[in-house]
């Protein structure tokens, strides 16, 4: 391997360091594979139970009436995630869009939205209206309240109890850490939180932002009481093949409203052409457990590499994993740029490009992003990003195969090593 890695620009010293780290990860990788095997069987059973056949891959145009493949895919998602219904559409452009649909469809003027997990992901601030924006929830008369996490990253149950009131209509729970240096929540933790909230107010809608968490465990938040789970098809469930799309799975009453919000009242799920995307959406979902396992191995490897070098990493090298994201606190903008340039240099697409920080819509500071992906913005593919602000943390995720994720981490280390920012 030394020769081919050398041709990619990875030195013998960096490769050797990676191999030392890798020797201790066999047991962790076996556990990841066991989860993937279970989830592969779960997806397979869902497809068989819904009698997926070759006609499901035919696309539709125009209104999209009688699109059997589109409708059956939604049944597959609902069965796999244990929900009454699902909305799985290429017309949902990204995770933020899916969340905006779910929120705006199920909140009316006078209702209150509660986040019991602190500040949401940056792009949702515009959706909610905490960063003023046209068409935000707050502009339409929805109020917002949030409860900060405890210092150790756990839920502040007394404060949550106090925050829930007669106006509380929907509780949003972000599973993954986003651009925060806090733990990602396990499905079990989310289930305990939902049970606590439902005990106080049984009719409240509990929605989980499931981005980056699908198929990391053998159960999903929908199996522990979530009324809706929401995600993006260019993350885990698309398996690297879905070129666009998002999903919302949950109670029929919630999904019906989401479908009306996506299209129009009275139209709902009856319209929405799938064009020629059905095959990719089915095949990507089928491959997702295996692709997610490769990304998880990459995250575990990254945690152990950078922890061994003395950096703060979340999760650490031995903690259980609840999403595919690995945060590394690098301490400087220079180190963030070097890390991301290494990830970009390891990409199959745009490997010659040098990522630099820039202003992105929805973010309140410059952001650097590295992603030489087949699908623009796909974070199940090898990618890294982060806001250029203290403590200068970079967030690594993805890799369509474990071996590509490994190469990306080694290349990120190579760039830091070349700039004298780390010593091996």
PLM regions: where:
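Acidic, PIN/NYN-like endoribonuclease modules and their adjacent C-terminal/linker elements
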Residues: 36-40
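Aromatic- and Gly/Pro-rich donor/ligand-binding loops
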Residues: 59
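Ordered hydrophobic segments in well-structured contexts
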Residues: 87-88, 327
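Generic structural marker for isolated residues within well-ordered, non-membrane alpha-helices
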Residues: 74
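Conserved C-terminal alpha-helix-loop-beta "cap" of PLP-dependent enzymes
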Residues: 307-424
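Conserved PLP-enzyme active-site core in the AAT-like
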Residues: 4-29, 33, 43-49, 53-56, ...
